[in-house]
UniProtKB/Swiss-Prot annotation:
Binds 2 magnesium ions per tetramer. It comes from the Bacteria. Belongs to the class-II aminoacyl-tRNA synthetase family. Phe-tRNA synthetase alpha subunit type 1 subfamily. It catalyses: tRNA(Phe) + L-phenylalanine + ATP = L-phenylalanyl-tRNA(Phe) + AMP + diphosphate + H(+). Keywords: Aminoacyl-tRNA synthetase, ATP-binding, Cytoplasm, Ligase, Magnesium, Metal-binding, Nucleotide-binding, Protein biosynthesis. The keyword Nucleotide-binding applies. Tetramer of two alpha and two beta subunits. One of its GO terms (biological process) is phenylalanyl-tRNA aminoacylation. This is Phenylalanine--tRNA ligase alpha subunit.
Length: 339
């Protein structure tokens, strides 16, 4: 029995000398010390030995077991240290090599355009107001002279959260909230994201940016509206830009109009973008409807006002000659690095 134990010890030593991996170490441990291992089987058979042999063989068996366990432990530690050394060597940074430049981001054209638009209106005395993107039906529709079952609601595919909550389809609700909370004179713009249930294509997106403006005071006329927007267009697109106003209809303004600007592609000569007309629709505007003023407890016999609104994305496309709105939302650095 003692000879068998010595053979097991020597066999384990020889195998451990050629071990190169943790998996091989585990296989050796199982072979000799596992539940069905060679040394374990001997220890289980000690009951068949005589009382004189049992303590002698038990002592030798425990010594062999301890030796194998300690040798495996040392081998495991050596392998672990070698792996660590290899890893550290591979991870070593050669400080004499030139470093890799970090990619530098640029401001998004939407952000640049929004800032330009804000600066222009701030220079004209406008303040910036904000409001929630999840809006009450009252502010998004009813207070803007768009009651339930009004035909204008069918023109805006709306994301409804429930019967009384929507994702705002315009930033006009901010105008209503401002008129409720402030007394005239009011001169404000409301930039922000809006949501429409539109299919994505070159000119439509379910999420886009809009900026609306409102002026309410005594004696405000359509001439004030026209002068403000013409000045904005020249500061935004240059002194050579031409504008014109066309009659239109909006439920919340009366009279209403749309303002066109000379095409940014052909400079008014006529092309595919402007469909040969030389003009591109820029924004909608009009005098605030008397009922909208009444809805905000402002007397239309004393005060009047004008409002306007435009898509910021459209402004970006006009300013930079971009023909596909999807480029603004794809985060393609090849495109964004041009600005």
């Amino acid at each position: 029995m003692r000879q068998k134990l010595e053979e097991i010890k020597n066999s384990a030593i020889n195998e451990l000398k050629t071990t190169l991996s943790k998996d091989q170490l585990e296989a050796i441990r199982v072979k000799y010390l596992g539940k069905k291992g060679e040394l374990t089987q001997i220890l289980r058979g000690m009951g068949a030995l005589s009382q004189e042999e049992r303590p002698i063989v038990g002592k030798v068996a425990n010594e062999v077991r301890s030796y194998i366990e300690e040798t495996i432990k040392e081998a495991f530690s050596d392998i672990k240290n070698k792996e660590k050394s290899i890893r550290l060597e591979n991870e070593t940074i050669d400080i004499t090599m030139p470093g890799k430049k970090q990619a530098v981001g640029k401001r998004h054209p939407l952000d640049l355009t929004l800032e330009s638009m804000k600066d222009i209106f701030i220079s004209m005395g406008f303040t910036i107001e904000e409001g929630p993107e999840v809006e009450l039906d009252k502010y998004n529709f009813e207070a803007l002279n768009i009651p339930k079952n009004h035909p204008a609601r069918g023109e805006q595919d709306t994301f409804y959260i429930n019967d009384n909550l929507v994702l705002r389809t315009q930033t006009s609700p901010i105008q209503i909230r401002t008129m409720e909370n402030q007394k005239p004179p009011i001169k404000m713009i409301a930039p922000g994201k809006v949501y429409r249930s539109d299919s994505v294509d070159a000119t439509h997106s379910p999420i886009f940016y809009q900026m609306e403006g409102l002026v309410v005071d005594k004696g405000i006329t359509f001439s004030d509206l026209k002068g403000t927007l013409e000045l904005f267009a020249k500061r935004m697109f240059g002194d050579k830009v031409k504008t014109k106003f066309r009659p239109h209809h909006f439920p919340f303004t009366e009279p209403s109009a749309e303002m066109d600007a000379t095409c940014f592609v052909c400079n008014g000569e006529g092309c595919k973008v402007c469909k040969g007309s030389g003009w591109i629709e820029l924004l909608g505007c009009g005098m605030v409807h008397p009922q909208v003023l009444r809805n905000c407890n402002i007397d239309p016999e004393v005060y009047s006002g004008f409002a306007f609104g435009f898509g910021v994305d459209r402004m970006v496309m006009m300013k930079y000659g971009i023909d596909d709105i999807r480029l603004l939302y794809e985060s393609d650095m090849r495109f964004l690095n041009q600005f």
